[in-house]
Structure formats: structure tokens, C-alpha cells
Amino acid sequence: MEYLSAFNPNGLLRSVSTVSSELSRRVWNSAPPPQRPFRVCDHKRTVRKGLTAASLQELLDKVLETLLLRGVLTLVLEEDGTAVDSEDFFQLLEDDTCLMVLEQGQSWSPKSGMLSYGLGREKPKHSKDIARITFDVYKQNPRDLFGSLNVKATFYGLYSMSCDFQGVGPKRVLRELLRWTSSLLQGLGHMLLGISSTLRHVVEGADRWQWHGQRHLHS
């Protein structure tokens, strides 16, 4: 009876709740993070690969394997060369972020022909970005005649949007060119018919006016 009287149902419920919370936390923490897509290029921007990874180390491992590189690698943002050297910063990157991989001794450089801020002048120290627009031209298929274009706009450093214009192959380009040529020739034909009809009416009108003039003279 003393054992039963010492039994506290509230304490048992608290213990069960604590164990359940601990199990839920462990299950949640053990769940692997989701795979996210990234675009990685070499320091010359001649090789570009699309890779998925859940962590910075996993992405570095895949870059080593895919690009056949060796040694210590460094990942930086392709647009401005910001180093991606911590897991916390990596997790803050958006999907489809363009990254550049650098081997030992290599350094980031801007794209050739890229327009700089203020026509080459340095950006004022106390200025604030309103919008930043980046253009990325790439090929998904070596047979594509024109590369695909990715346009990414960031407003006030908070809101961003991107749009992909997919490239097309030679057959589709030829098809579109023939279609536009056909439409152009058809429109040109209608225009020539209209001009011909107008000239005919002008000539017939002139003949009629000349005939009426001669008739008045004879009368």
C-alpha cells in the first residue's frame, strides 16, 4: 500500500513526455538535410557543371570527382568572388547559385567584358544597393546553337528573382527561321499586290481622264 501511495501519476506523465520529446529531437536531428542544386565552374569559366549537395563538404567532394581536380579547393561566388568557407554561409545560399572553384594558386577574376559599376569608378562606401542584375550564359547541350541565358535580379539585397531563357538547337532555329521567312514573304506578297492594284487604278484613271478630255475637245 505504501508503494502504491508513493506512486505519482503526474510524475509518470512528465517522464513519458520527456522521453518522447528526446526521441523526436534525435529523429529530427538525424534526418539528412535536403539536396540542393548549384552551378560550379572552373576559374577560367570554360567548364561548368550542375551539382547537388546538402553540405559544403559534400559539394567539395563532388567537385573533386566531377572536375577531376586535386588538392585543396576553395569555393567562391562567381559574381563577386566572395569566399564560401563556412557551413553556415553555405546553407544561406540560394538554389542554383553560381560558384567558382579555385585550386591552390588560382584567384577569382571578373568576367571579361563585364560592365562595372559607374563606368569603372569605385562604388561609394556609404552607398546602398537598390538592384543587382547578373547575366549568366551557358550551354546545356553541346549541340545547342545558342547558349541558354539566366537572368538574376536582387532588390535591396533581400528579394531576388531569376528567369531562364533556354537555348535551342540548329533544327529548331532553322524551323523558326523558315517560318519567319515564309511569313515575311507572304506579307511582302500582299504588299506588292496592293501596290499593283493601286498603280492599275491610277493608270486606268489617267486613261479615263484623257479619254474624257479628248471627247470634250471633239464636241
UniProtKB/Swiss-Prot annotation:
Tissue expression per record: Highly enriched in the liver.
Domain of life per record: Eukaryota
One Pfam family hit: CIDE-N
Effect annotated for changing K128A: Abolished interaction with PREB
Cell location: Lipid droplet; Endoplasmic reticulum membrane; Golgi apparatus; Cytoplasmic vesicle, COPI-coated vesicle
Cystine pairs: none
Membrane topology label: Peripheral membrane protein
GO biological-process terms attached to the record: apoptotic process; COPII-coated vesicle cargo loading; execution phase of apoptosis; lipid droplet fusion; lipid storage; positive regulation of apoptotic process; regulation of triglyceride metabolic process; very-low-density lipoprotein particle assembly
Gene3D superfamilies: 3.10.20.10
Changes seen on gene knockout: Mice display lower levels of plasma triglycerides and free fatty acids and show smaller lipid droplets in hepatocytes. Mice are resistant to high-fat diet-induced obesity and are protected against hepatic steatosis. Mice also show decreased very-low-density lipoprotein (VLDL)-triacylglycerol secretion and reduced VLDL size.
Positions of modified residues (Phosphothreonine): T18
Gene Ontology cellular-component annotations: COPI-coated vesicle; COPII vesicle coat; cytosol; endoplasmic reticulum; endoplasmic reticulum membrane; Golgi apparatus; lipid droplet; perinuclear region of cytoplasm
Domain CIDE-N: from-to ranges: 34-110
Example of a GO MF term: identical protein binding
Subunit structure: Interacts with DFFA. Interacts with DFFB; inhibited by DFFB. Interacts with APOB. Interacts with PREB/SEC12; facilitating loading of SCAP-SREBP into COPII vesicles.
Annotated function: Lipid transferase specifically expressed in hepatocytes, which promotes unilocular lipid droplet formation by mediating lipid droplet fusion. Lipid droplet fusion promotes their enlargement, restricting lipolysis and favoring lipid storage. Localizes on the lipid droplet surface, at focal contact sites between lipid droplets, and mediates atypical lipid droplet fusion by promoting directional net neutral lipid transfer from the smaller to larger lipid droplets. The transfer direction may be driven by the internal pressure difference between the contacting lipid droplet pair.
Family: Belongs to the CIDE family.
Name under which the protein is recorded: Lipid transferase CIDEB
Encoding gene (name): Cideb
